[in-house]
Amino acid sequence: MTSPAKFKKDKEIIAEYDTQVKEIRAQLTEQMKCLDQQCELRVQLLQDLQDFFRKKAEIEMDYSRNLEKLAERFLAKTCSTKDQQFKKDQNVLSPVNCWNLLLNQVKRESRDHTTLSDIYLNNIIPRFVQVSEDSGRLFKKSKEVGQQLQDDLMKVLNELYSVMKTYHMYNADSISAQSKLKEAEKQEEKQIGKSVKQEDRQTPRSPDSTANVRIEEKHVRRSSVKKIEKMKEKRQAKYTENKLKAIKARNEYLLALEATNASVFKYYIHDLSDLIDCCDLGYHASLNRALRTFLSAELNLEQSKHEGLDAIENAVENLDATSDKQRLMEMYNNVFCPPMKFEFQPHMGDMASQLCAQQPVQSELLQRCQQLQSRLSTLKIENEEVKKTMEATLQTIQDIVTVEDFDVSDCFQYSNSMESVKSTVSETFMSKPSIAKRRANQQETEQFYFTVRECYGF
Amino acid sequence: MTSPAKFKKDKEIIAEYDTQVKEIRAQLTEQMKCLDQQCELRVQLLQDLQDFFRKKAEIEMDYSRNLEKLAERFLAKTCSTKDQQFKKDQNVLSPVNCWNLLLNQVKRESRDHTTLSDIYLNNIIPRFVQVSEDSGRLFKKSKEVGQQLQDDLMKVLNELYSVMKTYHMYNADSISAQSKLKEAEKQEEKQIGKSVKQEDRQTPRSPDSTANVRIEEKHVRRSSVKKIEKMKEKRQAKYTENKLKAIKARNEYLLALEATNASVFKYYIHDLSDLIDCCDLGYHASLNRALRTFLSAELNLEQSKHEGLDAIENAVENLDATSDKQRLMEMYNNVFCPPMKFEFQPHMGDMASQLCAQQPVQSELLQRCQQLQSRLSTLKIENEEVKKTMEATLQTIQDIVTVEDFDVSDCFQYSNSMESVKSTVSETFMSKPSIAKRRANQQETEQFYFTVRECYGF
């Protein structure tokens, strides 16, 4: 009746179920391990972030101190060596103004990097400490919850196992009862078969036909038939009972199967996701705020620095020789102001304070005047030429000294490799052959300019 | 004839002139001193600028090295402790991405500050060296030219002095000759007066009336008159000659006066200005370029840093729990993927794989179903309540962890005094009472959230 090729044996079914449950149990363990690992990584990351910002705070503080020292060194120098009025005087000159702003900028940057360091230590790191605490606490709680969920799931799986086994048992009982019933039926059949052989063949082979047999035989047969009937009835009852139990057990198994699948689905699809959500509760948002604090600090530093650079740029734009000359001359007014005109001093009450241009000096003066006029017009022509040469020479010098060679953007365009920065950068200003050539040209032109000036009475 | 109250004496005039020339000479000396001082200050300023940038280059290099070490420390850690695949896996998580970008940023800043240092050393400082050389050379030449101009001016002043003295001399000679002439005229007059007394009173008192006197007396008188006449003629001639000389001398003096005043004017108004221009030739322009190189370097650094911060900001914006959860589950797919559904395992070829819901189990199942439905509707109502509570609690936590408390602009707003930065800044994050309160609230809410979840089966 049982065909091994067709039906799985109980053992096989149990073994399969065991395997399936073992796999799930292994997964559950791995899930916990995975959460542990994520927790560990998160704790490590937050520790790294703290260490990173602690170390960076030190670096920023170091940088700030060095910048402050640098500024103080030159500010002290300016304050000590010269008296205050002199210093104040010099400040009106545009290059000195640039220099002062440079020093101010260094002071400003020093201060800003101290602030940055302070924000790292007193704001950003505490945030990471908090995130770390929160994460640890949430992971712990989530793991507890997760463990409970897993235990519940395992309970469901065990229940399914037990329900399945019950079903097997009751079904086996039912099958057994059925086979026993069938056996009884067979025996009854056999008994009836005997009666038919020993008696008339007319009699149909039914228990009711026993009325026709002989009394004695009849009695024996009747008692035997009754026995079998009784047994059959018993077995029938047993079978019916077992069959019902098996049906109920199967129903329980089927219901437990649905419930287990639903539980497994709920655990894998919802609970695990919720569990990770609980571990993450606020993590990303808090990390976001900590990093935004960092960004806010950096951007404020940048803005402050930029403001300083703007001030310097403005001062550089105002570098102006003409106004500096004006300021210098005003500053040393007594040194540069022209003296009183020399007045005619009449000798012993000499009344004539005008040039006497009458005879006999008239002709001589006229001649002299003509000579001077002729000399003057020659000089004027010469002068025009010299002026043109000088202007052209000056323009050449101006062109040389105002060439726009100050853009260093190239130096900040690195190759993707991030390597060999030095070699790229060092090729800048001085090593360019064009610079040397330009400088030679500048000095030559300058020399020429001076020569021309000197030759023609400045 | 000379009235001391009315005319200045020669000595006074000479003394006044001397004083005036001395004053000019003192001014000229001061002018040279002033140029020297400006040259010295300029050389000093350029030296200071070189020292400043040399020292700043060191500071930037130091800063760069420290940043590099910082980045390497954590990058090495990430590389060594875990295998590459694992690291790669983790990189898909948004917090790890932020962390990697932070380290990248430090590397980028390290590189940029090296570049900055390099530009200081190899571009900006050489520029200042050049400007210093140029300035020194130009000052030297300008001073030579200035000295020549001053010598020329002194020559003109000396000439004026000598011309003035000549005028004084010739005018004195002229006056003397005139007075001698006048004396002769007086004598002649006297002689004629004698003749008139000794002779007729009719005769007019003229030299021609001598014809009427006695021969002897006539002869004596005539010879005396002739003598006087001769002397007078001589004196007349002398006077005329001296007068002409005096006029010429005065003319020379007046011309020299004009020339001197013009020279002085030219020197004070044009030459001094030109001299300063020559000292400044290219100075402001070259300084401008050197400082613009500095600005270009700083602005490029700023831009590069800003790009890095933008990348970090973008990563911070992309901090997302949901997608991280998704990625984690994909990463550990074998751990998180739901197992196969549990299938009905028929026992010994049991053909019924469906719930048997006929008599005699029907009524029992129906009863059970009704019980479950009633329980389910109770749970649904409860669930709705719990869900609402949980959502509200979660929202509270979300509100706490997403509060926008990351703006640190205030820390960069210093008081004008630039002092007491520390005290202002340290009042930030942790010391605020609101933070402690908020944290307590957060943990309480979190606890409540977990309790609710646990009570109602997660």
Swiss-Prot record, chains A, B:
Any matching Pfam family: FCH
Organism listed in the record: Homo sapiens
Coiled coil: 362-400
Alphabetical GO biological process terms: negative regulation of cell migration; nervous system development; regulation of synapse assembly
The name this protein goes by in its record: SLIT-ROBO Rho GTPase-activating protein 2B
Subunit structure: May interact with SRGAP2; formation of the heterodimer alters SRGAP2 function.
Domain of life, per lineage: Eukaryota
SMART domains in UniProt: FCH
